[in-house]
Structure formats: C-alpha cells, structure tokens
From Swiss-Prot:
Keyword line: Chromatin regulator, Dioxygenase, Iron, Metal-binding, Nucleus, Oxidoreductase, Repressor, Transcription, Transcription regulation
Bias-annotated ranges (Polar residues): 10-19
Regions that span the bilayer: none
Name of protein: Ribosomal oxygenase 1
C-alpha cells in the first residue's frame, strides 16, 4: 500500500504536538510607571499618544533626472563603463585594481545605490527616510547570490537549523518558526518551502565567497560591521510579521518579486531604535508611507526603527538579500564607553568627586522623596549638575573611540585578498610539502622590500595606558565572533614604525624606511606583520 507523503512541516508539527515555537513572540507592552526620577523626565511610552505630532512621512523616492545624469557621469570609473552595464564579477575584478580599500568601498557602495549619488543619499535618506531604487534591469545584482547557490550550499556545507538557517511562516496574524534540530538538508528544506514556509539564511557570508567579498569591502565604508541575511519566500506567502530592526537595511531584490510596506516609526522613542521590536499586529502599525513591489534588480533602503513587512505575490517566488550595518554605532553607544572612563579619571584627579555625600541626603533624595519641595533637593541637584559639567574635561575621548574600534575590528569579516595581494602575502608564499620534505621555506624580506597593509582598516593601535596593542582582522572568522578578538602587544621600538605604516597607506614603503632605531627592529616588525597576514609586498617573494 502506497504511503501518503507527509511534508516536513506536517512531520515537525506532529512531533511537537501540533505546536511550533515562535522565534519572535509578541512581547507584552512594558508597564512604565510615570514618575520623576531624581529630576529626570519620565520615559515616554512606546505607543502613539493623543495629540502627539506625527513624524514627517517618508515618501517614495526616485532620483531626479539631474541626479541620474550626474550619477551616470560620475560612475564611469570601471573601465569607462556605467555601473548599469557592468556585471558584478567584472566590477569586483576591476575593484581589485584599485589600490586603496577605502576607494574600493566607496565605489562598491555607489554601485549598490546607483544611480542615486552617495552624497545625496547620506544627506537626504541615511537615518532619515526610506528610498526605493527601481532599475528595470533584472540582472543588475546577478552574481551576488541565487537560488542555485542556495541549493549548492545546502548540499555541500554544514548548514544547521537555528544557527545558519530558519524556517518561518506568518499566517492569520501568527508568526512561527519551524526549525527541527540538526543539519538543514535540501530534501527537508525544499519540502518546507513547498509547504509555504519562508527560508532565511542567517549568515550567507560564511558560505558564499561573493557575499563575503562584498560585505568585507562595505564594512570599510560604514566603519561598522556589515552583515547579511538571505530570504527565500514561496509565491503568495509571507514569512515574517510586521516589525522594525536595529540596523540600517538595504533590501536587494535578486530574483522574482516582493510586495513591501514600510511604516514610519510609531513614536519618537522608536526613531533610530537601539533594539529590534517584537512582532506587531496589523492594527498596531498604522498606514504605510511606502507601498511598493520590488522587482529583481531593485533596492529598498529604510533606517532602523521603520516598521516593515514583505509578502510574496501569487505569481512568483522572491529571493532577496538584506545588507545591514550600523548596529549599536550611535553617539550614545560611544558615550556608554566614555562616561565611566571619564568618571574614573575625574575621581582620581579632582578632589570634588571624592568628597563625601551629605550626611542627610537619603532623607530628601530618592523616588520616595521626589515630590517633596525641599531646598536641600535643589542644592543637591545643582551640585550634581556642576559635577557633570566638570566631567566633560576628564573625558578620554580618543581612548573611548579606540574601545569602539576594538569592538568593530572583532566584528569585522577578514579581508578577501585579491590575486595580487595574495601573491605578495604570507598566503601566497611558496613554502610547501613535496618529495618528503618542506620546500621553499627560506623566503626572506629584505631592507629594500616594499610593503603595505592589506587594508586601510585591517589593524589599529590601541593603548590601555601601560601597554600598546595592535588589533587586527586578518585572522577573524567568516562566522561572527567564532574567534576571540585578535591582538598582540607591541614592543616599544615598533610603535612609531607601526603608526608610520598605518598612515602611509595606501603607499608602499620599504622596510628600510620604517622609523625604528635599528635595522634588526625594522626587519623583526616587518616579519611579524607578514606572518600575521597584515602586509603584502609590491613584488611576490621568492625562495632563496
């Protein structure tokens, strides 16, 4: 007797008692007590208030004809071809010839948002409002990622449910995740897809060299980690509930079509949100300020805090990749590192910060006393404000920036070296095993050897006051934070030379030109950086 086929979704539901866990359960609204806290105004609720002035609506944006012509003129950088006529593989090959990684990042970003100009985008849209870029060119992003590559990755790589891939659905206002345990194999994944589930790959850069290359270049544009998710949605379905994110999102349509609705932040507290939201119901989000269909080759950008949802049209599947950045990269995040350090310095250097609190301050300060009218409260608050003003002068801003930079370098993808860079680096060194012995190991840098960093942002000097460390990205994993942050302590004799090398980028400089006191110190630094993959030579090294 022939057994009736059960879908992967049906099997999973039967094993879990017909219930599926929700990955993003709708959280109940937090109950906030409206009270004064030591003179600080109470927090606003995360819902629209009556009489609150609505945020200025975003409008569907398209570049003006003037911008379009300027964009076409300015973008004739890739061998005289406009971006809309250049395939991605050719673009990446041409970018490899650009000797400054920051220039590469600028040009790749310009390709991403073409024909909108970089300056106008950051002036008018970045962190402000969405923009839709329609191209009528289905092949514009061809080569970035595809369903064929998705299938290849499932067949050849160890893709784990819940770690690298999610199976999701959103029906009748309910968002569910259907991840079974273990490896995500094509047989099960495509069965989920046939059952109407969306498939999300959480870190395609770990499996796709092209995505890795694009993100590793763009992270130098943003000065913040660039990440990506890939979403494959069956026709006529929706995989996710309305929500907002804590990142700047670039939705790149790769295949098929998808209907998107974007909504203004619901209140001022959610503008440029620091955290992603729970799932919203349809009646919590208001009317969309953008209601569009993305075709292959189109791009949709929206800032963090903008609510959005996407559903697939009945006549086509949808494959898109969301490129993201600027997570926890605000002034406030820098201040979180700066203020504790400033207070520590102030307490060491200024006796006013070490003087004891008033003997009776508990009698008139604190929440239970916040409604009292007491002149002692006024004097207390005035003294606090005076100390806060003085605190600014103790703020170690550069040290706090370095703390942010250390986090960024840990977040970074390692650079994907060009053929020229690899040939001149430790990764292209001729050392190998053959004829039962190690061959061509004797490769030596010389004083006249010209070297430079592999990337402008590949390394950074940071000091903790007593020692100086060099933090670097070349040994990072393509999997986020799989490895600990990479650094090593710099010898005093090497610090000036390392700073010289960083500031010399993108020029090649000879080992002899490094400002160390001895030739031995110059060579030892160059050899250390070469072994760490941080530098490459102008001409490939040969065995002696």
């Amino acid at each position: 007797m022939e057994r009736k086929h059960m879908s992967a979704l049906s099997i999973y539901q039967s094993l879990s008692g017909g219930k599926t866990p929700q990955a993003e359960d709708k959280a109940p609204p937090a109950k906030k007590v409206k009270r004064k806290e030591n003179g600080v105004r109470p927090s606003k609720k995360a819902t629209k208030k009556k009489g609150t002035k609505p945020l200025k609506s975003s409008v569907r944006s398209s570049s003006s004809e003037k911008e379009k012509h300027e964009g076409e003129r300015d973008c004739r950088e890739m061998n005289g071809k406009r971006f809309d006529n250049v395939a991605l593989d050719i673009l990446l090959t041409d970018l490899a010839k650009v000797n400054n990684s920051r220039d590469r990042a600028n040009r790749l970003f310009q390709w991403l948002i073409h024909p909108v100009q970089d300056k106008s985008f950051f002036r008018d849209n970045w962190e402000k409002k969405p923009i839709l870029i329609q191209r009528q060119n289905a092949d514009y992003y061809k080569g970035l990622f595809s369903t064929a590559e998705f299938d290849r990755i499932l067949r050849n790589d160890d893709v784990q449910y819940g770690v690298n891939l999610d199976v999701t659905s959103y029906t009748n206002g309910k968002r569910e995740t259907h991840n079974p345990p273990g490896r995500a194999l094509p047989y099960t994944v495509w069965d989920f897809y046939e059952s109407g589930c969306s498939i999300r790959m959480l870190n395609p850069q770990a499996f796709s060299s092209t995505v890795w290359q694009v993100l590793s270049v763009l992270q130098e544009k943003f000065g913040s980690m660039a990440g990506a998710n890939v979403y494959l949605t069956p026709p006529g379905t929706q995989g996710f509930a309305p929500h907002f994110d804590d990142i700047e999102a670039f939705v790149v349509q790769l295949e098929g079509r998808k209907h998107w609705r974007v909504y203004n932040p619901r209140c001022e507290d959610e503008v440029l949100s620091l955290v992603s939201s729970p799932n919203f119901s349809q009646d919590e989000i208001g009317e969309p300020v953008m209601d569009v269909v993305l075709e292959a080759g189109d791009l949709l950008y929206f800032p963090r805090g903008f609510v959005h949802q996407g559903d697939c049209l009945p006549d086509a599947h949808s494959l898109h990749i969301t490129i993201s950045s600027y997570q926890r990269n605000s002034w406030g995040d820098l201040m979180l590192k700066l203020m504790p350090a400033a207070l520590e310095v102030a307490m060491e250097e200024d006796v006013e910060f070490r003087k004891g609190l008033p003997l009776d301050y508990l009698q008139y300060m604190g929440v239970q006393n916040s409604e009292k009218e007491d002149p002692r409260r006024d004097r207390f608050m005035a003294h606090i404000q005076g100390l806060m003003k003085k605190l600014v002068s103790f703020a170690p801003v550069d040290a706090a920036v370095d703390q942010k930079a250390k986090d960024f370098l840990h977040d970074c993808l390692p650079p994907l070296l060009t053929a020229e860079e690899k040939a001149g680096s430790v990764y292209g060194a001729p050392a190998r095993w053959g004829d039962s012995e190690a061959l061509d190991v004797a490769v030596e840098l010389k004083s006249q050897t010209r070297i430079k960093l592999v990337r402008a942002g590949a390394a950074r000097l940071c000091s903790d006051g007593d020692t100086v460390h060099l933090y670097y990205t070349t040994e990072n994993s393509r999997v986020y934070h799989k490895e600990a942050s990479k650094s090593f302590e710099m010898k005093t004799e090497h610090i000036d030379a390392m700073e010289f090398l960083i500031h010399s980028y993108p020029k090649f400089v000879s080992v002899a030109s490094l400002p160390c006191e001895t030739a031995e110190a110059k060579m030892s630094l160059a050899e250390l950086l070469f072994e760490k993959g941080l530098i490459f030579t102008a001409e490939p090294l040969t065995a002696q």
